[in-house]
Amino acid sequence: MSRIGRKPVEIPAGVEIKQDGNVVTVKGPKGELTRTMSSDITMSVDGNVVSFDRPNDNNKMRALHGTTRANFNNMVEGVVNGFEKKLELIGVGYRAQLKGKTLILNLGYSNPVEMETPEDLKVEVPDNTHINISGISKQRVGDLAAEIRAVRSPEPYKGKGVRYVGEYVRRKEGKTGK
């Protein structure tokens, strides 16, 4: 069996689960998330514990089993605690600012890069070199953080660019003169 898929998910107090066919809705103190699960994986609720079962043991089902359980666990975790990603801008003149729901990034290009922030995510710029993204959906938070990082990902020679806080950028040595 899948090692992650067979672990049951504990449902904390204050979290409601509603299943309508393949559509699962998780409602908690921070909000509500809805996701369509695979029809091959069966979900069973027993008190405050949810477990997932698969029909057979082929590789595709094993992978789907663990993924379904992990996605559901992230939904429960998100409506209770939420998720947060922190980015830092490293480089001379690299800075970020928030105007309304628009994130403006000055990253060494000729024009600033403007990005609209989604309604369901909270984007903060505590100082002009740090960006905090928080929300209840782990996937949405990670996608927006990756999108911002992709505008100018860290380069290996000077380490300039947008990186996650605590991310290690492997450095390379430059060319040596004759």
UniProtKB/Swiss-Prot annotation:
Pfam families: Ribosomal_L6. The keyword RNA-binding applies. PROSITE patterns: RIBOSOMAL_L6_1 (PS00525). GO terms for molecular function: rRNA binding; structural constituent of ribosome. SUPFAM superfamilies: Ribosomal protein L6 (SSF56053). GO terms for cellular component: cytosolic large ribosomal subunit. One of its GO terms (biological process) is cytoplasmic translation. Keywords: Ribonucleoprotein, Ribosomal protein, RNA-binding, rRNA-binding. It comes from the Bacteria. The keyword Transmembrane helix does not apply. Belongs to the universal ribosomal protein uL6 family. Part of the 50S ribosomal subunit. This protein binds to the 23S rRNA, and is important in its secondary structure. It is located near the subunit interface in the base of the L7/L12 stalk, and near the tRNA binding site of the peptidyltransferase center. This is Large ribosomal subunit protein uL6. The gene is rplF.
